[in-house]
Amino acid sequence: MHNIHRRHFLKAAGAVTAGLVTANIALNANASSVAPKPRVGKSVIGLIAPKMELVRVGFIGVGERGFSHVEQFCHLEGVELKAICDTHQAVIDRAVEHIVNQNRPKPAVYTGNDLSYRELLNRDDIDIVIISTPWEWHAPMAIDTMESGKHAFVEVPLALTVEECWQLVDTAERTQKNCMMMENVNYGREELMVLNMVRQGVFGELLHGEAAYIHELRWQMKEIDHKTGSWRTYWHTKRNGNLYPTHGLGPISQYMNINRGDRFDYLTSMSSPALGRALYAKREFPADHERNQLKYINGDMSTSLIKTVKGRTIMVQHDTTTPRPYSRHNLIQGTNGVFAGFPNRIAVEHGGFGKSYHEWDMDMQKWYDKYDHPLWQRIGKEAEINGGHGGMDFVMLWRMVYCLRNGEALDQDVYDGAAWSVVNILSEQSLNNRSNSVNFPDFTRGAWEHATPLGIVGA
């Protein structure tokens, strides 16, 4: 979606910052020292919506990420693209043109102001809404979507405060609507293969994971009026913590059955100095440019350590500033061996095709041949053709539609989105309290202990 005018961002971000200060004082940096309020509805773990012969879709935000979803949905069967909403006419025109060029009916359009999306939500011919907007709008739009009787599918992160996480959970439980944060990396070929290997016991009992979003994005600072950098840059002036934890953390969480037999217990976090963005601004912009007037406070490298209730450990890192190759780490260590990503490599004590665990096995093909996930076996070629981060976007959307049309539970629920996203807030709370540990809220209200782990779903 087109960037919200700066005053809207500053107002929203200011409220977030004020909320964090209040939370730190009230909770002494302990996010779950206050017991959750009683559940209003019922748990949505394993929620199955009534089968939909045709999935009717509305889109809020069709800029960069949102337009990618429009493109992918045009390749899916059993869907209708009913309506789109954005505040920027150019991206609306592009989306409409693309949909029509794909021989699909012209969608209805909603625009004009930041709340025009509510007109889209008033329609009674939409089943699900895809939300691809600046971060501060994710939770409010998802809540409004569920309140309107529709299922919400939200870009990452799901929320920016602990309170927003609880509001999303409470709304999903009360309305019995899906609220899925669309963590696409969980549908990558490597990630799904590793999930299959974990479920088959290849790595033994799991002990430790490492997750990251290391992606040099300083160039986005040059996006001043439109596109992601026009609003995302400001978050580096408002928070010091892990701004974007879910891409790496999502897969590790599913490997470890987080919220389905285990859960995050507490976190400790620290950050490096915040130097890189100011240096980049000084080098790339005139001295009097706005980018040189900002005070960048988010540490160039954020590192958090999570302890789970079962005693496992997870390292989570965030760095979108320093010059280095892309990585999500994607490391999972068990009693029989380890998988690590970027580049992909495996070492196991038993069952390693004769390779010693003292050296990495970099030849992935034989592992794919044995452990490739059924979803990628079924639609991998189609995913590679249609693209979207190597095909993971297509697999995710395909799977979402499949579940809705066949009466199956989604692979990710509101509790997952809340638990993975809340690292954003808790990392800052820990850092502001000399890296003392901060407890995770139990968004499942205890239901994690008996929830069924995600299986190796087919198609």
Curated annotation (Swiss-Prot):
Binding site for substrate: Y213, R232, Y244, P245, T246, H247, Y326
Record-linked SUPFAM superfamilies: NAD(P)-binding Rossmann-fold domains
Cross-referenced Gene3D superfamilies: Dihydrodipicolinate Reductase, domain 2 (3.30.360.10), NAD(P)-binding Rossmann-like Domain (3.40.50.720)
Record's cofactor remark: Binds 1 NAD(+) per subunit. The NAD(+) cannot dissociate.
Superkingdom, taxonomy of origin: Bacteria
UniProt GO MF annotations: hydrolase activity, acting on glycosyl bonds; nucleotide binding
Record Pfam families: GFO_IDH_MocA, Glyco_hydro_109_C, TAT_signal
Keyword Hydrolase applies: yes
Signal peptide: 1-31
Mod. after translation: Predicted to be exported by the Tat system. The position of the signal peptide cleavage has not been experimentally proven.
EC number, UniProt record: 3.2.1.-
InterPro entries: Gfo/Idh/MocA-like_OxRdtase_N, Gfo/Idh/MocA_oxidrdct_glycsds, Glyco_hydro_109_C, NAD(P)-bd_dom_sf, TAT_signal, TAT_signal_bac_arc
Keywords: Glycosidase, Hydrolase, NAD, Signal
Cofactor: NAD(+)
Binding locations of NAD(+): E64, R65, D86, W135, E136, W137, H138, E155, V156, N184, Y244
Enzyme class: hydrolase
Matches recorded under NCBIfam families: TAT_signal_seq
Family the entry assigns: Belongs to the Gfo/Idh/MocA family. Glycosyl hydrolase 109 subfamily.
Cited function: Glycosidase.
The name this protein goes by in its record: Glycosyl hydrolase family 109 protein 1
Species: Shewanella sp. (strain MR-7)
Higher taxonomy: Bacteria, Pseudomonadati, Pseudomonadota, Gammaproteobacteria, Alteromonadales
